[in-house]
Regions:
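Local sequence-structure signature of Cys/Sec-based thiol-disulfide redox active-site neighborhoods
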Residues: 1-28
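Residue-level recognition of oxygen-bearing side chains
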Residues: 15, 37, 65
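Short, flexible helix/strand-to-coil boundary loops that buttress conserved ligand/catalytic motifs
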Residues: 17, 46, 63-64
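Thioredoxin-like thiol-disulfide oxidoreductase module
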Residues: 31-48
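Non-catalytic, surface beta->alpha helical segment in thiol-disulfide oxidoreductase systems
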Residues: 55-67
Length: 67
């Protein structure tokens, strides 16, 4: 399953979600602006932008990497 870490106001987060929906791929969207633990995880990984996307335990990258 894909995990998309993003924020509520993020064009590329929405694009990633729409792409996964279009391809009928299962995903979970995690809003780091509402979940402090998720935000801490992303910050500790060194990421400064969203979306950050994983497939199972494998990091994919951002939207451009997903495409």
């Amino acid at each position: 399953m894909y995990k998309v870490y993003g924020t509520r106001i993020c064009l590329y987060c929405d694009k990633a979600e729409n792409l996964l929906k279009t391809k009928d791929l299962p995903f979970e969207k995690i809003y780091i602006d509402e979940d402090d633990d998720a935000k801490d995880y992303i910050v500790k990984q060194g990421f400064k932008t969203v979306p950050q996307i994983w497939l199972d335990d494998n990091w994919i990258g951002g939207y451009d990497d997903l495409v």
